[in-house]
Amino acid sequence: MSIIKEFREFAMRGNVVDLAVGVIIGAAFGKIVSSLVADIIMPPLGLLIGGIDFKQFAVTLRDAQGDIPAVVMHYGVFIQNVFDFLIVAFAIFMAIKLINKLNRKKEEPAAAPAPTKEEVLLTEIRDLLKEQNNRS
């Protein structure tokens, strides 16, 4: 079997394709969440606490000196990334919770199957034998 044929079979297996689709959708979802946090959530939050833009929060550890740029710790960007993470984690939690709920409904035990003719006959024979033993 040629390597190309083996690779094609490997790549077309359900799990690999599902994983690839999940990664692509996850990357797109991450961009949406980042935009939600940066463009929708953080501006009103900054306005509520005095018109502050979280991206601007930073601490300068060392000022620029000539050609050497300043060393700056941008903790505002970190705060925004924490919000991104929390929203993504909550969205994934809710999706998993919904999936588990749907799976639980599927897993509810089905009604016991009707007994076969043989089982019915054997049950009747057993009951008759019990009656005979009780009479004796």
UniProtKB/Swiss-Prot annotation:
Q: Tell whether Transmembrane helix is among the UniProt keywords.
A: yes
- Give the subcellular location: Cell inner membrane
Q: Does the keyword Membrane apply?
A: yes
Tell me which PROSITE patterns the record gives.
MSCL
User: What membrane topology was assigned to this protein in its record?
Assistant: Multi-pass membrane protein
GO BP annotation list: intracellular water homeostasis; monoatomic ion transmembrane transport; monoatomic ion transport
Coarsely, its chief localization is: membrane
- Transmembrane ranges, per UniProt, are 17-45, 75-94
Q: What role does it play?
A: Mechanosensitive channel that opens in response to stretch forces in the membrane lipid bilayer. Forms a nonselective ion channel with a conductance of about 4 nanosiemens. Participates in the regulation of osmotic pressure changes within the cell. Opens at a pressure just below that which would cause cell disruption and death. The force required to trigger channel opening depends on the membrane lipids composition.
Q: What's the domain remark here?
A: The periplasmic loop between the two transmembrane domains modulates channel kinetics, and in particular the length of time the channel remains in the open conformation.
Stated family: Belongs to the MscL family.
Q: What's the name of the protein?
A: Large-conductance mechanosensitive channel
UniProt source species: Escherichia coli (strain K12)
